[in-house]
Amino acid sequence: MSKQTLSFQAEVAQLLHLVTHSLYSNQEIFLRELISNASDACDKLRFAGLNQPALFEDAPQLEVRVSFDQTARTLTITDNGIGMSQQEAIEHLGTIAKSGTKDFMGQLSGDQKQDAQLIGQFGVGFYSGFIVADKITVESRRAGLPASEGVRWASGGTGDFEVETIDRPARGTSVILHLRDSAEEYLNNWKLKSIISRYSDHISLPILMEKQEWKDGELINPGDEKGGRQPGAMVKTGDWETVNQASALWARPKKDVSDAQYAEFYKTISHDPLAPLTWAHNRVEGSTEYTQLLYIPAKAPFDLWNRDKKAGVKLYVKRVFIMDDAEALLPTYLRFVKGVIDSADLPLNVSRELLQESRDVRAIREGSTKRVLSMLEDLARHDRHDSPAPQPAEGADRVSDVVDADDKAKEGKYSQFYAEFGAVLKEGLGEDFANRERLARLLRFASTSSDQASVGLADYKARMKEGQEAIYYITADTLAAAKHSPQLEVFKKKGIEVLLMTDRVDEWALNYLHEFDGTPLQSVAKGAVDLGKLQDEAEKKAAEEAAEAFKPLLARLKETLKDKAEDVRVTTRLVDSPACLVVHGDGMSTQLARLLKQAGQQAPETKPVLEVNASHALVRKLDGSQHFDDLAHILFDQALLAEGGLPADPAAYVKRVNALLV
């Protein structure tokens, strides 16, 4: 059989049906697409007019107009851009997925492409009009052609179209949508303005709509005011007004934007009445080019911990709004950041509603993350004397300096930020390996030296005692529980500072942070305490002798508590308390196990180690007591209570205590 090369065939009517009914998830996007096409047409004329000024004819001011006729049930989008000849209308409107804008971009030089604000690229946006219209009529005349060479194109979206020559004095294009009965909402001035404000507020061209004003109805009985009136209505005045900003604050040079304007823009995009703590506005130049304006809020939203809630910055492509929560452009642990990212390089799906993973997306994500961390490092430096921030990696994209108020105004802001978002920032230790060191420098904790969450790891390390070999910390449910934990007693005695960690995320996060600047982090509630050079030989010898002398008692305790404790041993960490619970060095703490169970997740069934203070009177009283079993269980349950836990059988605990009291 001979080999053949054949072309794919398409059922045009079915293809149009798919484009108009399956491609777009949001019906109102049709207006964004048609306004973007109109903007492209004006931009094409702007470029063509550089060499042929006569193309502007007698209307050099480029604009887009949106109007509607409730009686005729039509919605019209008109531009005075480049327009189309009859042949161009047949080629561009009669061929699905043929992008005139993409063809035009291919004819521009490199510098012209940089300056162009052309939006379209797929050649299907026009057909989104059929989402709301059962017929579309296009009237157009190409700039430079006589008025007699206008063209009218019309189609019902069923696979065929009609074309005829018309007289059209004005250059440019009018797209007339004959709306379906179900699309009556788009014959409403307020509705159209809200869509334009959402999607096309920042394109560089003015978008005009006819003004409306309220007009009272006629008197039911002429001359009789008391007889009532017919219902009033909004009526058109004949004057046109600009309904978009026609500029993008983030596209302006930073020197031309005041702090007040930055703050006001933040309130507009975030719906937050409070001013932001700080912001960064920069244009990144490199393999991927984009502009970003990122804000750090002053207050956490009520749903910050709702993992199902979408969060992220607003994404624009060439000033056209694409999506509200572009989660792919910032990691989850920075979900509190608000702002705008605008790029021409991002790969979108055909409907321009979804962002596709690519090298450019990853580059923007990495650059935006570094920018946010730089803002936080800047706040931290001004908040107090802190360790210097890491320098940008060699070859990183060039970014401008952070734009913010003067240095004096930054004092205290990092403490304010950390009180609101510190716990979220800790999630980054497990999510962002590349920036783990920078994140570690931004962490703040309370300690045995300060009840305020103001101690950084660098600060702690700078004041470690001579001979101290680890950064010590303890996790607990509350600050009070951490401060009064029995495990801290030997550290307090020796004047060793211990970090107090009370956020739910702490223990999970520290699974990913094992050392800081070469110094290991060690929980005082895990494993055996080895203070190394901080413990003198006499103390070590006394501990060894006590362990040997108490072997029979320890064996008896272990047998009695075999269902509760994995092991029983003499402690070196207690001074005043009779006992405490610890876990093996690589084990899950009882606190983390409790948190997992409270969250409805499975936690491994593990038993803690009971450590007893050989010098405590209660422990010494155990040997020979007729209430040995009851005292052993009470000792264990009290140790559990001291670290914020509850006895497995509270009633049995109370019964044992009562029995000893009488």
Swiss-Prot record:
InterPro entries given for it?
Answer: HATPase_C_sf, HSP90_C, Hsp90_fam, Hsp90_N, Ribosomal_Su5_D2-typ_SF
Q: Which UniProt keywords apply?
A: ATP-binding, Chaperone, Cytoplasm, Nucleotide-binding, Stress response
Where are the residues of the annotated region C?
595-662
Region (Disordered) residue ranges read 382-402
Name the species this protein comes from. Answer: Verminephrobacter eiseniae (strain EF01-2)
Write out the similarity annotation: Belongs to the heat shock protein 90 family.
Instruction: Give the start-end ranges of region A.
Output: 1-352
Recorded hits in Pfam families, A to Z, give: HATPase_c_3, HSP90
State the protein's name.
Chaperone protein HtpG
The highest taxon in the source lineage is Bacteria
Localization annotation:
Cytoplasm
Where does the UniProt entry say this protein principally localizes?
Answer: cytoplasm
